[in-house]
A protein has these predicted regions:
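Non-catalytic C-terminal accessory region of glycerolipid acyltransferases
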Residues: 24, 33-168
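Conserved nucleotide-cofactor-binding alpha/beta core module
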Residues: 1-49
């Protein structure tokens, strides 16, 4: 199974469109709050699966707890991929996309980490964010952010959130 994680939208039309987009290539869109259940279910039944997480989004206010430099700006980054990978010791694979010609793209699977529990807390998130930045710099025209990626400043985080859990 191939799962794509998504945040359900309040607007039914927009939500349906997002689910349709995330359903391409036989993917199964899973609301973000259900992903752990899906992972446990698939592991228990011995099924192979791939779960797709989008790492270029900005965390919500309650999750401003890990910051690093991203595209030359102090940026809060999501840590969910690392938390889930470490909890279940799942390998993390990144996707690198390139345009072949109009409407045609190729995707390479890049092994980021096969044993996340062997890393220090926060290291996988740093590796993932650096790789994402490298991919963006290689082909910036393939990236479109329809949200405000840098809408938060570090002062937004409560007391800098335990002084940035996992920060060195």
């Amino acid at each position: 199974d191939f799962f794509t994680l998504y945040k359900p939208l309040h607007d039914r039309v927009a939500d349906g469109m997002m689910r349709k987009i995330r359903s391409r290539f036989k993917a199964k869109p899973v609301p973000k709050n259900d992903i752990l259940r899906k992972i446990v279910e698939n592991r228990r039944e011995g099924r192979l699966f791939l779960a797709g997480f989008i790492g270029d989004q900005t965390p919500n206010w309650a999750n401003l707890n890990f910051w690093m430099e991203f595209l030359h700006q102090d940026t809060p980054v999501l840590v969910g991929t690392e938390k889930i990978a470490r909890k279940f010791n799942l390998p993390v694979i990144s996707l690198r996309m390139r345009k072949v010609r109009r409407g045609y793209y190729e995707v390479d699977f890049v092994d980021l980490c096969s044993d996340p529990q062997s890393l220090e807390p926060g290291e996988l998130t740093r590796m993932h964010t650096r790789m994402l930045e490298r991919f963006i710099r290689e082909v910036p025209e393939l990236w479109l952010w329809s949200h405000k990626r840098w809408k938060h400043v570090r002062e937004d985080s409560i007391g800098s959130r335990e002084e940035n859990r996992w920060q060195k």
